[in-house]
Amino acid sequence: MTVKPELNEITPYLQFNRQQWGNFRKDTPLTLTESDLDKLQGQIEIVSLKEVTEIYLPLSRLLSFYVTARQTLQQATYQFLGKPEPKVPYIIGIAGSVAVGKSTTSRVLKALLSRWPDHPNVEVITTDGFLYSNAKLEKQGLMKRKGFPESYDMPSLLRVLNAIKSGQRNVRIPVYSHHYYDIVRGQYEIVDQPDIVILEGLNILQTGVRKTLQQLQVFVSDFFDFSLFVDAQAQVIQKWYIDRVLSFWRTTFKDPHSYFHYLTQMSETEVAAFAKHVWNEINKVNLMENILPYKNRAQLILEKAADHSIQKVYLRKI
């Protein structure tokens, strides 16, 4: 069966509805069980096996094609040079708003991609580890701008991406704790020449005005082999964000060591109002100014409905 995309000539994307995209699964086997999937769920987002089958399996198949093609190209380069070079990971960037489901998407893709024989070693990195510490943000008056571009140690992130793309071994990634809402000083995760790196972050597709030829500026997206944007209506994401805060309020915030433990002294109505205020004053502003304007730089867009299901897929024409 040939799948015909919904084609709009004024857009650089091929558009597929859920059924059309699901047909691209072909004979790709479903290797995840319900038990496997339970370990990948988000705080409020529940991904079903049906969602994996219809959306994520076709996506993993496409990405596997891309990764294998890049590996073949690298082998051709090594053959031309007459000597092996360090393995260069394939880097996938996943962007989108707070609470839109980037982390869940990253975990599901890691689980699926690692089951393909040509690229079993997949690592997920989050840009949260490159946020400045709370102490530094407070000193610079940026605590209310946490998550905005200026709150990240971009030079460190770019150095790490350069090291990974250069094939360096044992690259250290700073650890961020959502429980403490801060960088965990002295703790690192190690990335050691994986086949694929998935980088998840808010502003990773953002660019700026490049400097002069003498001072060329490098952007995070320059290191991507493939980029993906998780999208939904802002009003829908606002509800997801409030639901997520309330879910944490009922669970992890009860720990006295949690940064947001003080919220447990409030009523559910007060916490919901607090979350809505944070959304309107911080997260929505960041979405509109620094995230959404760069959506069309992604090679693939996953468009979600209010129930978290992906209803449309946009694939950039090659």
From Swiss-Prot:
Pathway: Cofactor biosynthesis; coenzyme A biosynthesis; CoA from (R)-pantothenate: step 1/5. Keywords: ATP-binding, Coenzyme A biosynthesis, Cytoplasm, Kinase, Nucleotide-binding, Transferase. GO terms for cellular component: cytoplasm. It is an enzyme of class 2 (transferase). Transmembrane segments: none annotated. GO terms for biological process: coenzyme A biosynthetic process. NCBIfam families: panK_bact. This is Pantothenate kinase. It comes from Coxiella burnetii (strain RSA 493 / Nine Mile phase I).
